[in-house]
Amino acid sequence: MITLTTDFGLKGPYVGEMKVAMLRINPNAKIVDVTHSVTRHSILEGSFVMEQVVKYSPKGTVHVGVIDPGVGTERRAIVIEGDQYLVVPDNGLATLPLKHIKVKSVYEIIPDKIRKFTGWEISSTFHGRDIFGPAGALIEKGIHPEEFGREIPVDSIVKLNVEPRKEGDVWILKVIYIDDFGNVILNLENYEKPRTVELLDFNLRLPYLETYGLVEKGEMLALPGSHDYLEIAVNMGSAAERLNVKVGDELRVRLL
């Protein structure tokens, strides 16, 4: 199985081009579209999305992610080999999914080598179609990454700074995802459940509950959410709009 996560959107030929290129290489590939609606150029958001899919995928799954604002530059295209595979630009996209993969080795994809498998020229602006998609299709077909890449040190790959910080009793947390409901997901997991969550930047104290419907419509709350991260929400409303926050913003939070 191959999963696809991109910021291509659904307007235009890009997703279709990528998928037919993959099927040309591997006609029997089973391709799952996770989303093509990651906010444009948002590597952090894409990393979160890929993490959730990796957590529930079987061993051997190939995850292709293309949120690639550095396409055509010196940034590397890589394959991370483990109990699952990540095929991504080396720009930090692998950061969160890596928490759930037992990494064996990492390979830099060599364009000239992969072109021998595809048979077409590589565009400087569409590596999803010409490099990442084909690499994923080849792996799912049984071609080892060393056939089209070179091994590089595991600790050389780029990672985002997504670790929560604590200053006294205050957490400095980052917004790592906002879903279509406007729920705000923060980069804190494995915490002791509080009774109250204080958002210091907004002078708000929120009840910490298990689900949205435990407060009245329009009321704000904090909860564990379905992804094991601390979440801020409004019942039948948008916490992101209420707080005017976006992915990457930092919030000062106290758990009480």
Swiss-Prot record:
InterPro entries: SAM_HAT_C, SAM_HAT_N, SAM_OH_AdoTrfase, SAM_OH_AdoTrfase_C_sf, SAM_OH_AdoTrfase_N_sf
Family: Belongs to the SAM hydrolase / SAM-dependent halogenase family.
Alphabetical keyword list: Hydrolase, S-adenosyl-L-methionine
Organism lineage string: Archaea, Methanobacteriati, Methanobacteriota, Thermococci, Thermococcales
EC number: 3.13.2.3
UniProt: (R)-S-adenosyl-L-methionine binding residues: N183, Y212, S226, E231, V234, M236
Species of provenance: Pyrococcus horikoshii (strain ATCC 700860 / DSM 12428 / JCM 9974 / NBRC 100139 / OT-3)
Protein name: (R)-S-adenosyl-L-methionine hydrolase
GO MF term list: hydrolase activity
SUPFAM superfamilies: Bacterial fluorinating enzyme, C-terminal domain, Bacterial fluorinating enzyme, N-terminal domain
